[in-house]
């Protein structure tokens, strides 16, 4: 699906064909999206998590954003860290904060939080822990719930 009503160039893809398309947009001579500039995750609400990838072709000087939506209950997207090496830490950060599992990733583990941290802090339904190993987890500011 392509949103042509926007100045931004983005395409929505289903997760099941993402890896094949990723390899194609990276190697197709007319595209050559050889630079993954950013990857991020967003909790869209209503049981939808979204992973976004921003690409640039240095040869053709064009840009593209790929968006992939999954449900919270089946938050799995094929990893592209073997296509663009930089995706390694991008995908790990999104996994750590939102719990999207990047299948096929060679080292998918938490990168910002301790391995035994409970939950996914950037999900809208996240319930913060009262304590962590007996230490009180403070709120950033009183009244923020």
Which positions does each model-derived feature cover?
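Terminal low-complexity/charged segments
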Residues: 1-145
């Amino acid at each position: 699906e392509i949103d042509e009503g926007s100045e931004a160039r983005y395409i929505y893809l289903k997760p099941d064909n993402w890896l094949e398309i990723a390899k194609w947009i990276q190697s197709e001579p007319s595209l050559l999206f050889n630079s993954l500039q950013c990857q991020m995750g967003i909790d869209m609400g209503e049981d939808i998590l979204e992973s976004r990838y921003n690409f640039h072709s240095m040869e053709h000087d064009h840009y593209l954003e790929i968006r992939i939506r999954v449900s919270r209950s089946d938050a799995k997207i094929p990893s592209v860290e073997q296509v663009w090496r930089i995706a390694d830490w991008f995908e790990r950060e999104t996994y750590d904060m939102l719990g999207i599992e990047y299948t096929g990733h060679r080292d998918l583990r938490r990168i910002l939080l301790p391995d035994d941290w409970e939950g996914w802090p950037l999900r809208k339904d996240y319930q913060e822990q009262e304590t962590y190993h007996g230490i009180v987890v403070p709120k950033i500011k009183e009244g923020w719930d």
